[in-house]
Amino acid sequence: MKYRIEAKDYFTKFTNEKVLGMTPAEHLKRKLEVVGHEFSEDADNIYYNDMFYLDSYVLEKGPGAAAEVLEEIHTGIQFHNATTAVRVEINASLVNEGVKLMSIEDSYIDVNVRIGRDTVIYPNTYISGKCRIGAGCILGPDSVISDCFIGDGCEIIKSVVKGSEMGNECKIGPFSHIRPDNVIGDKVKVGAFAEVKKSEIKDKTVIPHLAYVGDSEIGRNCNISCGVITANYDGRVKSRTIVGDNAFIGCNTTLIAPVNVDKDTYIAAGSTITEDVSEGSLAIARSRQTNKEGWVEKSKRKRTEKS
């Protein structure tokens, strides 16, 4: 009996990259040959790569029955069984390579993903595309990571990270959204409910929570406080915000792009920055506070008189 191997759609981006020294097609070819079947590139039949099921079936029924379990996927149950089997096989191979999965069954990891030793992956974590993840990371729970290069010792907790590059010892989350096309340096923190898009964030900068950084370049050792927004879109075009090293951007600041904030600057909380800020300056862009003494009592008397 002859079989042809074709590209599968089990994974987001299934390629011919090797897993444990062989491509997926080579894995299946070897298994077919072991049980006495001929492999042919130009055969008419198409059979899917359910290697886990093939192994268990052959052990139970013997080599002669192997052909019965190689079949196309036509139903939802067949798809579920196939993807579950392949997922478990991939995850088990990662465990054998030194990755620490808290649950082999409850994490989805594409065949193209490469993960360093001693990285811990918690349940309900989805890692897809061509991800390269370093050693000693903590990923999840409840995280989505796709097409990323992530350094050693990073933590990504309850967050979405897509199409970005990240250095070593970064902390992301919980509930952060790292959108595509970011370059994030070493020891950067992007905390709760913060969003970063198409930006460069340099080493040791912190964005602790509740901030939006888009189309920006943020220098080293900066503090982007709670409620900071880079207003990058004017309804027609998107513009960039540039912040120099060691800048402190106070709470609830809006940076109206295009704008440059030089190094070693302070932006007062509540400011709306529309002009460049020079090195070493304190920028204050908010209306002056006015306190009206006795206003509450006067207001009460007026309401009483009217009634």
Predicted feature residues:
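Structural signal for interior beta-strand "rungs" in well-ordered beta-sheet cores
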Residues: K100-A285, Q289-T290
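Terminal amphipathic alpha-helical/low-complexity segments used for targeting or macromolecular assembly
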Residues: M1-D106, V111-D118, E279-S281, R286-S307
